Design a protein with these regions (language model features):
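A structural boundary/capping signal
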Residues: 1-291
């Protein structure tokens, strides 16, 4: 059965054409349903309005296929928004905004406001314990105790290359992640607490730095907030056969942090042979690297 053309409907699909496409979408022939799916997707986000009521269809197969199309359309919207963010903003983009936009490209239905409220609540709990204490190593001790001991966040050493480790919502859901995304979480909590915490993009690792006029320490968030000295960082670089450069210990900008996160995901999806995601992250890397 041929998928109907819509050339006679410049203002959008007619009701008759929508009905025909839905009938074809529920067809048992995979070739027919696939063609109908492609035709509906070609309508873009405008198709969402008339598709949504069919999530309550009496036909299970139609409900399932409509839900999949709506999810795909939301992913496309999120992809467009994040790519525009990458192209529009430079090195000093807002890290939290970028991290949530990135997460929505894979999990388009996440409740970002809900996650942000949880981060606010975590910061409020820590702030209550700190009282009027100014930025100090004690602040890090309280933050680390709450994050790693009470809430149980940890580095995911067993499944280091799981893509979920790189999406902030999944890091919060599972309380585990990779070095860079755990550092983003730490960084965002530090910002809420007005602590001088920044990210540091070491070769083959990512840590945070806490610096005041009297103290400078590096925080290995992946290893439950282990505090490192400058000498420890240099020793790590020597152990991995990397010559030391002062720039390695410099603060990473938000844009460079997102670039590294996307580059990591691009490599992970390449290794997993997930070509669609690999191509998507290649676009993000190119866009972020322009700045």
């Amino acid at each position: 059965m041929a998928v109907p053309s819509t050339s006679a409907a410049p203002g959008g699909l007619t009701d008759a054409l929508k009905s025909a496409l839905l009938t074809l979408l529920a067809d048992e022939d995979p070739a027919v349903s696939k063609a109908a799916r492609a035709r509906i997707l070609s309508e873009g986000l405008e198709a969402q309005t008339w598709l949504r009521p069919h999530l309550r269809s009496g036909e299970a197969i139609l409900r399932r296929r409509v839900a999949e199309i709506l999810d795909t359309l939301e992913r496309q919207r999120a992809d467009t928004e994040f790519l525009a963010f990458c192209l529009r903003h430079g090195e000093e983009c807002d890290l939290e905004t970028g991290a949530w936009l990135l997460a929505r490209t894979q999990y388009p239905d996440i409740n970002v406001a809900g996650y942000q409220a949880w981060l606010d609540s975590m910061a409020a709990d820590i702030r209550e314990r700190l009282g009027d204490t100014g930025p100090s190593l004690r602040c890090l001790a309280v933050l680390n105790d709450h994050l790693f001991n009470e809430l149980g966040f940890r580095g995911n050493e067993r499944e280091f290359y799981d893509p979920q480790n790189s999406y902030l919502n999944r890091v919060l859901d599972r309380r585990t992640g990779n070095p860079i995304c755990l550092c983003i979480l730490y960084w965002l909590l530090g910002r809420r607490l007005r602590l001088p915490v920044v990210g540091v993009a070491l070769p083959r690792h990512f840590v945070c730095r806490f610096q005041t006029p009297t103290d400078t320490v590096f925080i290995d968030v992946f290893r439950r907030g282990k505090l490192l000295t400058r000498a420890d960082c240099i020793r790590f670089l020597q152990q991995i056969g990397q010559g030391f450069q002062e720039s390695y210990l410099a603060p990473a900008t938000a844009g460079r942090t997102l670039l590294r996160l996307c580059a990591n995901l691009h490599q992970i999806y390449h290794e997993l042979h997930r070509r669609e995601e690999e191509a998507r992250f290649q676009r993000y890397v190119v866009a972020l690297a322009r700045h």
